[in-house]
Amino acid sequence: VLLLLAVMGVTTVLSGLISAGPTAAAMMPVVLALADGPLAAQSDWLAVAFAASICAGSSLFLWSATAGLLMASKVEDARIVPDDDGHPPQPYRWGVGPYLRYGAIHAGVQFSIAAAWVLVVL
């Protein structure tokens, strides 16, 4: 189970860094080796855990979210100005830093749910 959780963690981070498709292709030999070896009895659940960790990683960074870069562009184009707090108004910028606060939380919640599910099922 710890090996599967480690593979899920690596898959989540890779999916965030290089996107879901390449991560699925790169990690598939590892998942198939686990399905043929120590986790053969749970191979169906292994595929679900693999997919869940790819989904979690897809939320992690702005560039790995499906519409992340488009959303950042649209927020800047909207020229949203935050409420007056005594400072001169500045248009709101939605980039990697602001997105990461939400993306990391969302990916963490998704990964935690997937890991808890793995611990219950396996």
Label every PLM stretch briefly:
Residues 1-86:
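Membrane-interfacial helix-loop connectors
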Residues 1-13, 100-113:
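Entry/N-cap segments of selected transmembrane alpha helices
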Residues 115-122:
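Juxtamembrane boundary at the C-terminal end of a transmembrane helix
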Residues 73-109:
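Interfacial loop-to-transmembrane junctions
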